[in-house]
Amino acid sequence: MNNTKSPKNVSLKNQLELWLFCALIGAVAGALVWILLKIMAVGTEFLWKWLPGKTSFPYYTILICVAGAAIIGIFRKIFGDYPEDLETVMEKVRTEKRYEYKNMLVMMVAALLPLLIGSSVGPEAGLTGIIVGLCYWAGDNLKFAKQNTRNYSQIGAAVSMSVLFHAPLFGIFEVEETSEEDLAALTKGSKLFIYGIALAAGTGIYASLSALFGAGLSGFPSFDMVEIQRKDYLLMILYILCGLILAYFYQATHKLTGNISNKFPAVVKEIFAGLCLGITGSFLPVLMFSGEEQMGTLMKTYTSYLPLALIAIAFFKLLLTNLCIQFGLKGGHFFPVIFAGVCMGYGMAMLICGPDGGHVVFGAAIVTASLLGGIMKKPLTVTMLLFLCFPVKMFIWIFIAAAVGSKLITLKPEQEPSANYSKQ
């Protein structure tokens, strides 16, 4: 009796294994995103609301930021320069053909600590490293997963970003516009189908956990539908220019703060960043944290700000974000950059058109798209990221602004410097 399996049956079995494992990766990614955001929400509530309500310690913000920064510095000195951002993680996957997964708990702790003390960074850094690390662990320990490890790692990273930002297509475009190749041997249609399976699983797990135990980070709020007037289209060039100025400022300060941070020894640099963060937060609390909750507040109270104050906040937010990233209070830059773009858009629109809601929303959308385009060089990714944040009718204008921004800003920030942290 011939026990040889037909090529068709083997192919079907491999395809089913691929689909099932991608669904599992998506589910794990969704669960990890929820866990990170829930711990962050509980920790932030304790440190910044419950504890201050029980004590009346002077200079509380400075104390928490400096003490937390010192802990982060010591942690990084012992365990290494974590967390790593998406670009660094995927670059290691491309060049080294693997990603080290032995430090996943360290990555999670390193991602959480800066967020808890109010660092001006987002939560995405660290998540992708954990997901990709899990995929390579599976490749090393599960026979059927070995040949598709790189595919799994890219899909896992894409799903985690999409679930985190509540933007279904953002993750796949972020990974695709980053990678030099497609998802290995997969065809375009198959790739999107597999990503859809993983995303459905990830979103389902995240939504289920949020419904059962409460959500963590709520994500950026959505702007209401507004009427776009002829004046807004005429002002598009000005808004794009403002976004380009912010993008250039972000890249220049990224390089400057990186060069300055190299002159500081380990731990001292983190303490310095914590001191700057604490002093800034004592006078301008809106500059602390990643910016998603602050943006929700800003949407309701922007008329209480002077336009020039909002413009100044945009520049200070980018400067503080780069200071935190380069001096060791590391995290992602997407949330703070979006907040800065919205502040600049609001400020410019209010200067020219007054506080009318339609004008300021359009200004915020175009400035933010141009800013992100200039920093990321990925107009499709920018469009997918902002798609659920701004009204659908602005979709084409957001893409145009992001495309212009990605072409006109040529200053490229240097690779983020790493301090000489000794691993003991």
Q: Model features per residue range: what roles?
A:
Residues 1-424:
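Alpha-helical transmembrane segments and immediately membrane-proximal extracytoplasmic
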